[in-house]
Amino acid sequence: MIENRSFSFVDCYGDVGDYYTKPAWGYGWNATKECGEGRMEYVTGSPISRVNPWYLRFTAQDAGQGFWNKAYDGIYLEKGKTYTVRFYARAAQYPEGNITVQVTKDGRICAQAEVSCIHAPEKTWQKWNLYEAALEAGETIRNGRFTISLTKPGTVEFDLISMMPDDAVAGVFRKDLFDLLKGLHPGFLRFPGGCIIEGNTLENRYRWKESVGDIKDRRTNFNRWAVHLTSEENGWHTQYSHYNQTLGIGFYEYFLLCELIGAKPLPVLNVGLACQFQSYELVEMDEPEFQEFLQDAVDLIEFANGPADSTWGSVRAKMGHPEPFGLTMVGIGNEQWQTEKIDFFGRYQAFEKAIHAKYPEIKLIGSAGPDITSEHYDKAWEFYKKEVPARDNFCYAVDEHYYVKPDWFYAHTDFYDEYPRDVKVFSGEYASHPISGMNLPQANTLGGALAEAAFLTGVERNADVVVLASYAPLFARVGYAQWSPDMIWFDETKAYGTPSYFVQKLYGENMGTVTLAMDGQEKELRKEQVYANVSLDERTGDLILKVVNHNDCEKTLELDLGSFRAAGTAKNVILTGEGENAYNCIEHPDSVKLSECESNAADGIVLPANSFVVTRIPTVR
């Protein structure tokens, strides 16, 4: 909830191959003025951690002076809820007095606590102490001001100031976001993302080892998306230039999240390349530094799966999880591709050799590049098709990415029908883009979601080759998103699922165990802009039909169950809204939503205009 909690943010500038940052240690912080302005200095010298060396030295000339935090869009409190504030402080020149923590709104106090400050005797070392305060909200407010003040004149130093609601799952994850994610019933979670792994430069790439251990020892890093869409017109500097990574959620927390939502973890690793779209930087394979990237991969597996007394397994155990996380898959690079100067295939081979020398059971994910239409894609598949027959575990699946218009998805529901079956596919990043840009919740239309649902009928039909699939991106904060569409949008008060979210949810909740052949009927239906797939859940005996009606009128789908016989009423779940351009938003989160009804299978399936229908029919044979 607090922004720039360690006084370590930077302001980001630049363009391809030329990115740089300026110090912004005090970004988001200001002195209060009600009792006169205290002095705020951002200093270094004796930090709580050398990793984040800057901290605030605050001097109050009079009692009651303090400082407040921007906190993104301000603090949101819900009446009756408790919020825990933690911070490190050191009484540099503060022989008496306490520290007050408040959330205020328009001058009135909405939550408050006072903590006793630890005062060291004169002429002794003043050490850092960790403080904790519980704030109970007296009312529900938005745009509140988080404030810390001194009850007496003096100088106190502060660092790592945090505020979390007490209902945060595992003390880390915002509950409404967690519930939405768990509600998808995901089979796996790919983290921490794509381009973030690579970085604009190798200096700001995501280093998993910096994201584990004590929170105070995690280095703040600027975010690759802080410089998205910079240009000469905006001075190579956008409104998101202070987008930094505090690593409050690191690899330990990601593994824990996977465990809590019942998903397999799929971490992605850097292969010694910065983002190929934004940089020319790389570590040559014959340089000693390249070995560090290989070692990071091997050490990650030990961190996830190693014994509690191993080097990296002990780090996991110390953080509270002595049992292994059960990692089975690792992504080798993000959107990497082969060029005259970059031998990505050689890098993949080096990682495969290093990992499988110690962990032959780990499944590796390769990369087909940034798209599925260029020569990068063709070259990648030539490489994997050549290598996989010689060694079964060389590559578990090849990661394909496509952000395309809805029409492409409709036209390519048969995309995987003719794929060879010897090398598997991971549809690692995909989304329908009716429109795209920054901060566009309206980009997540019903029409876009229906196109994704139609495409997924083909993915599911070819589940023998497409073994993994994931929509991207997952989360977007309203007013802070550099990319649209996204699956789940939220602000400081609430979160909601988009039409695409409900498509993913319906697929996640209705996974069959066997895909059934439609004997070419799917091709005939496509001519009528109806897209379908049928599967069987052998555990329950249910036939599961997934059908998209891409028409402005209602359709009825007649059913012939063949050797199956209906053993009960069909249950239908329907996703639709007021036309293809309908979308959900913070103000109207249910414009596109699910509805349920029952029907007789003998009467067929009624498909409302512009809808996605999932029907479960209990059967016997």
Whereabouts are the PLM-identified features?
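Extracellular and organelle-lumenal recognition/adhesion modules and their flexible linkers in secreted
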Residues: 1-246, 264, 282-291, 341-342, ...
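C-terminal beta-strand-rich structural cap/linker in extracellular carbohydrate-active enzymes
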Residues: 591-621
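Carbohydrate-binding surface patches
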Residues: 529-566, 572, 610-613
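Catalytic-core region of carbohydrate-active enzymes that cleave or remodel glycosidic bonds
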Residues: 353-356, 387-392, 396-510, 538, ...
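Aromatic-lined carbohydrate-recognition surfaces of secreted/lumenal glycan-active proteins
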Residues: 312-320, 356-377, 424-429, 465-476
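Conserved, mostly hydrophobic/aromatic
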Residues: 87, 185, 258, 300, ...
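Active-site groove signature of glycoside hydrolases
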Residues: 150, 192-195, 271, 276, ...
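An active-site-proximal structural segment forming one wall of the substrate-binding cleft
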Residues: 138, 166-186, 246-261, 288-329, ...
